[in-house]
Amino acid sequence: MSTAVAEFKPSEKLLKTRNIGISAHIDSGKTTLTERILFYTNRIHAIHEVRGKDGVGAKMDSMDLERERGITIQSAATYCQWKNHTINIIDTPGHVDFTVEVERSLRVLDSAILVLCGVAGVQSQSITVDRQMRRYNVPRVAFINKLDRTGANPFRVIEQLKEKLKHNAVPVQIPIGLENDLKGIVDLVTMKAYYFEGKDGMDIQEKEIPDDLKELAQKKHEELLDAASMFSDELTEALLEGTPTEEMIKKAIRTGTIELKMTPVFMGSAFKNKGVQKLLDGVLDYLASPVDVKNKALDQNNNEEMIVLESNFEKPLVCLAFKLEDGRYGQLTYVRVYQGKLAKGMTIYNMSNNKKHNVGRLCRMHSDEMEDIDSAEAGDIIALFGIDCASGDTFTDGKLKVSMESMFVPAPVISLTIEAKESKHLNNLAKALNRFTKEDPTFQTHVDQESGQTIIKGMGELHLEVYIERMKREYGVELITGAPQVAYRETITSKADFDYTHKKQTGGQGQFGRVAGYMEPIPLEETLDYDFVNKVVGGAIPREYIQSVDKGFKSCLERGSLIGFPIIGVRCVINDGAYHDVDSSDMAFQIAGRYAFRQGFNKANPQILEPIMKVEVDGPSEFQGAILGSLNQRRGMILNTTEEDAYCKTEAEVPLADMFGYSTVLRSSTQGKAEFSMEFSRYAPVPRNVAEELMKKYKVNNKDED
């Protein structure tokens, strides 16, 4: 992954830039860590806690809702200076319902800090975040946080990093004390002890390693050298000669990290102000600068051939809009500059629609505050004003016609109906929906053609709750909401033939088209919703009407015959047909295709699929029975249970349909001491009794159509 940029000597500024994300499972302490980083780098002058008594809330949680709920909902951007380096930071949500915020951040970052709780270790969302980091080849360091908490065990977390995430996790530090006795860390590169004293841990004392830790430190130091030497012949030779230097060790660790073959592990407690400054040193020492990362784009003038972009401000401009926000300053577009230079007054072109825009105002963001700048270069993350675009659009200065691959957007799994309490708010509701769907690709809306109701879709209950609350606060729209609906799907389980002739004579030109073939299931693991195969020979269906048949098939996918939900996992093969010289037309073959599909679908043993969620529940061991009982009652399949230090962790797969209201049940059955997280896992067939109930309900609701 690491690459030298040909014939271009990168500027000092580029080499001293780090674009990093801070990601983790909810409540691992990401936002608290970011708050400390901003404090130690003098970006803020007082520390405010996420759920602090002062009511101010963390700097990066700028939305009122974030401060009230104590969670991060949107990714927030800021930058700071540390030891002559510029660090652009994006603090991302840990809750799985806001996973697209993590996705869009990692798409434009060069590196990341994976924050893990020293007690809970690797949790479900840690696994999701790690998978997202792999998708975008993001090098990372791990920070084991909360080592001041009862039950903290960093070495157990390192084993989980190796086993659950398959990381080559190597500690570069060990803690001095744990829980209430946490005093500092031992640096395994310098082999010195560091204590964080004085107000807010500002006074860093370097001392010799305590006697009771010398043996462990030496053992871990040797393990670190052994791991790092895999990435440096120079270090290997120096080890044989007994002369390794700090610089050699750091250089080798950096190479392994950037090549995604090693994860250096840091330790501390952000809340107790211990270890954060040394983590910042690690960001500079081990994480990638823009020069170290190979970014690619698709050349639109050359069959979308992949080209490599250079972090060179003298080259033609290429930048990516990765996030939209409609704040108090109007629409903001967050942009990562990959190549070239972006300046006020420039004309830039949106590669998705060839629209040109004039750059009126450029800013660096600091959470919800901004600082005006005149220009930005390759490697910078900044914000533009007044640019109408969508998330994932590529901009150039017109000299290149390239587009960057957009980010992965997961499909929504939950929906509900909404309507404004008062008709005078309809205009504001439309504005809110338009804005939110533009900002967040996982928040979707449509009007049901039959009922005329507005339906919103999202990643979970909390996701939709937050948008409903934002409509009320930001647009003054009070909503009446229906019960949450599960995003069921329909599919087929066997192969079935179809042969349908559409014939209509009404005087003048009639309609004629015959479509024959078969449909078969696509295995769910292939994650392909639909496949069309043309095996017609001898001109039984003229070439110009093949696409008409495909259109007819596709029109049926939106609404299955069992319960009216979208159809997935169907391969349609046409192998015969017939046409009429006068009466055949595009519309005739579309209609024939539609009826042929329905005929085949009803014969192919259709079934209903439901979303299955991966659920993880953490709580005191005394409530394990209550937790298992609550999951079993919800058709849950227990995958794994672990118990350590009077805490139990339960992993299960549970149908989404049975998870509504689970947070209330869990709270009451565990005296509010347990918490859970869930994320979409897969689609699976619903049991027969559930299917019958769903079909019965669908028939009652649609009896007027019959």
UniProtKB/Swiss-Prot annotation:
Chain sites annotated for binding GTP: 24-31, 91-95, 145-148
Record InterPro entries: EFG_II, EFG_III, EFG_III/V, EFG_IV, EFG_V-like, EFTu-like_2, G_TR_CS, P-loop_NTPase
Entry keyword annotation includes Mitochondrion: no
Presence of the UniProt keyword Nucleotide-binding in the record: yes
One GO molecular-function entry: GTPase activity
PROSITE patterns reported in the protein's UniProt record: G_TR_1, G_TR_2
Gene Ontology annotations for the cellular component aspect, listed alphabetically: cytoplasm
Keywords: Cytoplasm, Elongation factor, GTP-binding, Nucleotide-binding, Protein biosynthesis
Compartments, record wording: Cytoplasm
Residue intervals of the tr-type G domain: 15-291
Signal peptide bounds: none
Highest taxon in the source lineage: Bacteria
Similarity section: Belongs to the TRAFAC class translation factor GTPase superfamily. Classic translation factor GTPase family. EF-G/EF-2 subfamily.
PANTHER family membership: ELONGATION FACTOR G, MITOCHONDRIAL
Record's function text: Catalyzes the GTP-dependent ribosomal translocation step during translation elongation. During this step, the ribosome changes from the pre-translocational (PRE) to the post-translocational (POST) state as the newly formed A-site-bound peptidyl-tRNA and P-site-bound deacylated tRNA move to the P and E sites, respectively. Catalyzes the coordinated movement of the two tRNA molecules, the mRNA and conformational changes in the ribosome.
HAMAP family according to UniProt: EF_G_EF_2_B (MF_00054_B)
Protein name listed in UniProt: Elongation factor G
Organism: Leptospira interrogans serogroup Icterohaemorrhagiae serovar Lai (strain 56601)
